[in-house]
Amino acid sequence: MKVGITYHEKFSQYDLGPGHPFRGDRFINVLRLFEDQGLLSLPNVTVLSPQAVSRQHLLKVHDGEYVDLIFRLAETSRPYDVETPVSPQILEAALLIIGGAVEAGKAIYEGRVGRAVALGCGYHHAGRNYGGGFCLFND
């Protein structure tokens, strides 16, 4: 059975700073570990390259006013709250990470892989009209 792993080099932009557990290098470190263990050279493992989700895609889950707020905050690198920073880089990474979840599901649905791992996913503290717990959006 073929296994897909979603990854994009810009995932590492979801970095909340030195000493924080949400560091951007965690994505590179996981990929490096996979490489060191020979997982990425296995014939049944493929890296899936996600595309950033659109605003329209976000609106399937999130309120439009909330989505607009996050995009405005990103323009000026202002935080959403004390634990949820926003910047153009973090927003770009978030849209790609969510795109990774979409790509993983799509690859399974289309039969390109039997299973998939969406690196970076698990941002579950955001609700329809709020963020929190380091999460801008719910993936």
Annotate each PLM feature.
Residues M1-D139:
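HDAC/HDAC-like amidohydrolase catalytic core signature
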